[in-house]
């Protein structure tokens, strides 16, 4: 059995449809079970195909997918069509529509006002995939629509962490853009196969072949078209299916009627044959069966092509490319068919966890209803009924009312309420089995926590969380505002890239995030959701300090003032280290190494030394910014049988580290951003001149017919107010994205200014 949903409110037709889909097999078997008065073996719930007795039939028809792309490529518009064509919503509303309703997946008021996706949103829908024999097969598609702006990249990270496949959307005019490359990197990090949809084929300057070339060259993944457009720009009518060599048109007022004809327009036959041959040639380099047919100069059948595309897509060696225009209601239904045909079901994906009881040994999880529960909390939201925790169930079944264990905290909790999500709407369910995406209410946990039924102690690896690069001091206009701290605590809990701390010296509240827009959104949410207006300081750059050479240390801390004294001696050295990955794939930029032998420093004091080292890294001695890329090696020392203590060794190591740090030729590092600018060709000189003033290094320039795209490396310290500059210099037609790239030594004059300012504050 795959899923048995007991929907608490059976008013709506779609709930009844979903219930029928998941319980058809169950009801038959349950009736038999009652007649026989005995338990039914679980194997009766499984399909009798090639993978009989291994996966439920319904599980093979489940897809968990994400919609990802560069900003303004049409992700949310595409998702709106998917929901409409699958019957999930009754009408289409545009992202910036005149009716002011907004797209279903943009549920936040801010999202609808700004016309951008800020938070990922989850939903599910049913799609009837027509089979070769004319029958229809029902598929369940769980969808997460993600933001395209780099400032909200954590939403993409946590979505891809739990999804099985993805639809990568490209703009037919702009092709592969900066955030496309970022999303590709995230997909590779979590081994997510993808199919590609070239959107906006109705726009002037649309060039799908250029976009496919960029997929091959910039993303370094084999890509080939499985469709070609019928018409272009304003005359776009439909697509030619290169696998079956047939034409597909969207008819009806909103493209809801799909018309398939066996003929191809005469003027497109040559192009169709050319692109089909290229598709076969590309697959021949990946798939053995197609390769043999290619060598024998035999033509593969549509079934062989589809099998090869699925195999190559699942192995992440290939991405099939589809075309259309979501806004013009063209090409969306064929892509839904492709989601069913080429993207994996949960059992096609290998997921692993770490067995805590076996020294964190890697174990493979099984997408099986009967196995012990393993589920991951991947996102938190504060809702009207308490904390809403988004869950991906990898193994077993999550049931309302059952007791489950948070492996990370050790707490045993009861599942009070379980829901399926449709953007900001929810539908109660009794249970969610392996492969499901659902949400729990009223469970206190952190993002990344693993839950089991208590019989096993597995933890799943956490998602990658980038470090914030911009900070801002804030304070409420009304000092008595009770919601200020409450709001910041909530935002931190929901968003791992949003950080809050109190500056120890100025006592100011400092918020940190991924960019100016990221922080602006939270300030607006403070004002709207908590009615707390804030006064902000000047944006701060996340400078860092590091050392450039090795320096030894030897320090004796000795204090006697009556009673028990303090005694501790530490010796060793500090040195520069390159960042390295830990076991979870996260970069570590500091290291404490204990080389003390013979008990010169008793073992109970070593943790105090390590703690002091980490505390020193939090605030550097040049400018007060954190220290990175530093290794401390503790080699020797001395202790007193009476006067030594943890405090004494913490004090000794703190003084020793400061002396060694100042002797190791420390410098200040500044964050360098990868900036991509797209603007009209006529404004190229103005844009380059503006970036030159900001000390940019131009890395690449791609000039199109009407627009050019420029990639540059720019110090973050020089990028403030750039958004208003580019708007004014390009008459509002230019846009840019910015992503953290690396740290480099700051220019000498910048270092001197920062050091002088810090010394002035600490006189």
Curated annotation (Swiss-Prot):
Cite the residue span of the transit peptide.
1-52
- Entries under Gene3D superfamilies matching the protein: 3.30.230.10, 3.30.70.240, Elongation Factor G (Translational Gtpase), domain 3, P-loop containing nucleotide triphosphate hydrolases, Translation factors
The keyword Protein biosynthesis is annotated on this UniProt entry? yes
Going by the entry's taxonomy, the superkingdom of the source organism is recorded as Eukaryota
Stored InterPro entries: EFG_II, EFG_III, EFG_III/V, EFG_IV, EFG_V, EFG_V-like, EFTu-like_2, G_TR_CS
Question: Which biological process annotations from GO are given for this protein?
Answer: mitochondrial translational elongation
So where does GTP get bound? 69-76, 145-149, 199-202
Q: What is its main location?
A: mitochondrion
Q: Which UniProt keywords apply?
A: Elongation factor, GTP-binding, Mitochondrion, Nucleotide-binding, Protein biosynthesis, Transit peptide
One GO CC term on file: mitochondrion
Which segments does the entry list as coiled coil?
Answer: none
User: Membrane-spanning residues where?
Assistant: none
The annotated pathway is: Protein biosynthesis; polypeptide chain elongation
Protein's cellular compartments: Mitochondrion
Q: Which GO terms describe its molecular function?
A: GTP binding; GTPase activity; translation elongation factor activity
Stretches assigned to the tr-type G domain: 60-347
| Task performed by this protein | Mitochondrial GTPase that catalyzes the GTP-dependent ribosomal translocation step during translation elongation. During this step, the ribosome changes from the pre-translocational (PRE) to the post-translocational (POST) state as the newly formed A-site-bound peptidyl-tRNA and P-site-bound deacylated tRNA move to the P and E sites, respectively. Catalyzes the coordinated movement of the two tRNA molecules, the mRNA and conformational changes in the ribosome.
Which family is this protein grouped under?
Answer: Belongs to the TRAFAC class translation factor GTPase superfamily. Classic translation factor GTPase family. EF-G/EF-2 subfamily.
Q: Which PANTHER family match?
A: ELONGATION FACTOR G, MITOCHONDRIAL
Kindly provide the name given to this protein in its UniProt entry: Elongation factor G, mitochondrial
Q: Which organism is it from?
A: Schizosaccharomyces japonicus (strain yFS275 / FY16936) (Fission yeast)
């Amino acid at each position: 059995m795959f899923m048995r949903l007991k929907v608490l409110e059976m008013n709506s037709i779609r709930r009844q449809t979903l219930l029928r889909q998941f319980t058809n097999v169950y009801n038959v078997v349950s009736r038999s079970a009652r007649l026989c008065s005995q338990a039914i073996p679980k194997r009766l719930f499984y399909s009798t195909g090639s993978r009989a007795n291994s996966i439920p039939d319904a599980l093979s028809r489940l897809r968990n997918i994400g919609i990802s792309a560069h900003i303004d490529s049409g992700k949310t518009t595409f998702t709106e069509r998917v929901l409409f064509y699958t019957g999930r919503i009754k009408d289409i509303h545009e992202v910036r529509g005149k009716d002011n309703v907004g797209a279903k997946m943009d549920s936040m008021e801010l999202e609808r006002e700004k016309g951008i996706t800020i938070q990922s949103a989850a939903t599910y829908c049913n799609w009837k995939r027509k089979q070769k024999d004319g029958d229809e097969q029902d598929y369940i598609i769980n969808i997460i629509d993600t933001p395209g702006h780099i400032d909200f990249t954590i939403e993409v990270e946590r979505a891809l962490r739990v999804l099985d496949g993805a639809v990568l959307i490209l703009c037919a005019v702009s092709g592969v853009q900066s955030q496309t490359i970022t999303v590709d990197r995230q997909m590779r990090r979590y081994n997510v196969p993808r199919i590609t949809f070239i959107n906006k084929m109705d726009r002037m300057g649309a060039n799908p072949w250029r976009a496919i070339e960029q997929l091959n060259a910039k993303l370094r993944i084999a890509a080939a078209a499985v469709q070609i457009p019928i018409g272009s720009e304003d005359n776009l009518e439909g697509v030619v299916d290169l696998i079956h060599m047939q034409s597909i048109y969207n008819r009806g007022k909103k493209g809801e009627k799909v018309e398939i004809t066996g003929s191809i327009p005469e003027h497109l036959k040559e192009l169709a044959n050319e692109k089909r041959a290229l598709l076969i040639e590309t697959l021949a380099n990946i798939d053995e069966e197609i390769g043999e047919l290619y060598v024998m100069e035999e033509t593969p059948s549509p079934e062989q092509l589809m099998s090869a595309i699925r195999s190559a897509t699942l192995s992440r060696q290939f991405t099939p490319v589809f075309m259309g225009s979501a806004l013009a209601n063209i090409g969306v239904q064929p892509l839904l068919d492709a989601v069913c045909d080429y993207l994996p079901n949960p059992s096609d994906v290998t997921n692993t966890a770490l067995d805590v009881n076996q020294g964190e040994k890697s174990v493979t999880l099984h997408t099986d209803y009967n196995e012990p529960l393993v589920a991951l909390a991947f996102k938190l939201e504060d809702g009207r009924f308490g904390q809403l925790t988004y869950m991906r169930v990898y193994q077993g079944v999550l049931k309302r009312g059952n007791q489950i264990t948070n492996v990370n905290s050790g707490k045993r909790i009861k599942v009070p309420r379980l829901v399926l999500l449709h953007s900001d709407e929810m539908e109660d369910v009794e249970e969610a089995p392996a492969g499901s995406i659902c949400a729990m209410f009223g469970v206190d946990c952190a993002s990344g926590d693993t839950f089991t039924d208590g019989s096993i102690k597995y933890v799943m690896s956490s998602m990658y969380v980038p470090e914030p690069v911009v900070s801002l001091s804030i304070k409420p206009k009304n000092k008595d505002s009770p919601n200020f701290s409450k709001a910041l605590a909530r935002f931190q809990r929901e968003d791992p890239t949003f950080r809050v701390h109190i500056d120890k010296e100025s006592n100011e509240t400092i918020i940190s995030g991924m960019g100016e827009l990221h922080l602006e959104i939270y300030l607006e949410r403070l004002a709207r959701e908590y009615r707390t207006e804030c006064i902000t300081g000047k944006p701060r750059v996340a400078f860092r300090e590091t050392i450039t050479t090795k320096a030894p240390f030897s320090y004796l801390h000795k204090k006697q003032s009556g009673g028990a004294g303090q005694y501790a001696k530490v010796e060793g050295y500090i040195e520069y280290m390159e960042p390295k990955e830990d076991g979870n794939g996260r970069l570590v930029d500091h290291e404490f190494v204990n080389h003390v032998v013979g008990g010169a420093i008793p073992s109970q004091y070593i943790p105090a030394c390590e703690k002091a080292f980490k505390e020193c890294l939090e605030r550097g001695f040049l400018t007060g910014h954190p220290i990175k890329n530093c290794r401390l090696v503790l080699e020797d020392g001395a202790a007193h049988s009476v006067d030594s203590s943890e405090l004494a060794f913490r004090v000794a190591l703190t003084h020793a580290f400061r002396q060694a740090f100042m002797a190791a030729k420390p410098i200040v590092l500044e964050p360098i951003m990868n900036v991509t600018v797209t603007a009209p060709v006529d404004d190229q000189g103005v844009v380059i001149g503006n970036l030159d003033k900001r000390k940019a290094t131009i890395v690449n320039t791609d000039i199109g017919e009407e627009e050019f795209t420029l990639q540059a490396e720019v110090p973050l310290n020089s990028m403030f107010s750039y958004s208003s500059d580019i708007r004014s210099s390009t008459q509002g037609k230019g846009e840019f994205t910015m992503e953290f790239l690396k740290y480099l030594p700051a220019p000498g004059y910048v270092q001197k200014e920062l050091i002088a300012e810090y010394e002035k504050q600490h006189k």
